[in-house]
Amino acid sequence: MENIRNFSIIAHINHGKSTLSDRLIQICGNISNREMSNQILDTMDLERERGITIKAQSVRLNYKAKNKKNYQLNLIDTPGHADFSYEVSRSLSACEGALLIIDSSQGIEAQTIANFYCAIEMKIKIIPVLNKIDLPNSDPDKISKEIESMMGIKSKEIIKCSAKTGYGVYEILENIVCNLTPPIGNINKPLQALIIDSWFDNYLGIIVLIRIKNGNLKNGEKIIVMSTKKVYSIAQMGFFSPNKTKTDILKCGEVGWIACSIKEIKGAPVGDTITLASYPSEKMLPGFKKIFPKVFASIFPTISEKYQSLKNGLIKLSLNDSSLFYEYENSDSLGMGFRCGFLGLLHMDIVKERLEREYQIELIITEPTVIYEILKKDNTKIHVKSPSKIPNKKYINELREPIVNCKILSPKKYLGKIISLCVEKRGIQNNLIYLENKVIIIYIIPMSEIILDFFDKLQSISNGYASLDYKFKCFNKTDSVVIQTYINKKLIDSLTKVINKNYINLYSKKTIENLKKIIPRQQFDIVIHIKINNKIISKGIVKQVRKNVLEKCYGGDVSRKKKLLKKQKIGKKRMKKIGNFFLPQDSLFSILNIKKNKK
């Protein structure tokens, strides 16, 4: 174990994390120049196209240091986007150290700070790295001072590098060897292996990524997943180099994968402990906090016949993504689909795009909402994932919405505009921290205000220089209300929303205006009602189309005309009573703010 080093690379999105991983792999000779490609650890097409890391990946590197000793370096690459911050904490739990990468042209950003404190809380040794020093607009000295004032890291400890050209990468490798401690563990103790991640393989079933904390694990041995007490026999095991490489043993301190015919992802819960059936451990390792979805949206196929394909796609995606939640939903207006839970808007976008690409399904995805906590009259609490499922007010004591602690890092000159935006979004100021050229703005804001257009507006008013990080804080009582839309006395469930009292008039007025534009006129009036607690707060009418029944009456007796008009009047009454209007789905999408993306 003396020559093993386990480390992660953590950074804000687009600070050069994957490029540095590529360079480390190339220098350690794990892959030939012919096989080398950009973002080699980003195996999904989506990761390469978007230039982001979505799933944490691991690779074993062999490095001969200046002291002539050979070292095994286990690198776990991590995502940079805030939506996937849970992957960062999971990766760090398998490591003794981390490279904190900061772009020398952009400086410290919100997610940089979040990752830094996450590593500090987990007592991870940090090696600070200033990347992209080859860029013309990089300012290493200025950013070094920024790091020193914000994080307390001395400038002389910061390594300057360019992952693109390879400058400074050898210095990083030497720092990993010299400054990170080897793993702590006992080879003679009962096996304790932490499950870092798990995913589905078409041939091997569930593959489990583990870090051996104590003991050794050999191929063919029987293991116990400690939370379920289920016993499995190891069929294959190995490590990534970055290609999947088989081995017969994983030793104390190492990171590797095992395949043991586990059929579903629940069979190997992330954060669980694996031990030997023949020599079991009595204690489980400390796991991870359970991840709960933050954002919910409904997904429907545009063609109802594709429902089964959508169901199969979600089942398979959830095998590789334990944070994806879904349940069956049937909407009167949109048909059969699923209510899905995501970690954030990027996570939602990734899932949608993977479903469309990998399963050839054209999808409709509704406007995202948050989960609400309800304190009922009998003092029981329930959590509701969809506004249409919120009970009637007479059964509710309190409606509570999720509140987030929102940190914004921005140049000082945009402070006024950002504060105005936060106030507009019902934010309460918690703190302002002034730095040399920047300011950290901390606000408590309802999550429902964050998940729609907050980030886009923030980028717009700061010319793209502000960065955002937010974490769930608690559920707070809200004065928001459930608004329902009825068309000809029929509830349109997909138009049920939770709206803050300040926006009720604006929302109801806009909804009626938009519906009047898109509902096709019939031979009877179509009445639109906006209701709160069954009380009508706004009304609109799509006027009927008048059919000229006298068109063929060229003159003649007036009584004949009166008879035809009376007959028409009776017919219209009957049509209004039993007639169904047709509301085109495309029209409904525009009202719902729904994203409908074609392939």
Swiss-Prot record:
It is a peripheral membrane protein. Residues 2-184 form the tr-type G domain. Pfam families: EFG_C (PF00679), GTP_EFTU (PF00009), GTP_EFTU_D2 (PF03144), LepA_C (PF06421). CDD domains: EF4_II, EF4_III, LepA, lepA_C. It comes from the Bacteria. Gene3D superfamilies: 3.30.70.240, Elongation factor 4, C-terminal domain, Elongation Factor G (Translational Gtpase), domain 3, P-loop containing nucleotide triphosphate hydrolases, Translation factors. It catalyses: GTP + H2O = GDP + phosphate + H(+). Belongs to the TRAFAC class translation factor GTPase superfamily. Classic translation factor GTPase family. LepA subfamily. This is Elongation factor 4. It comes from Wigglesworthia glossinidia brevipalpis. The gene is lepA.
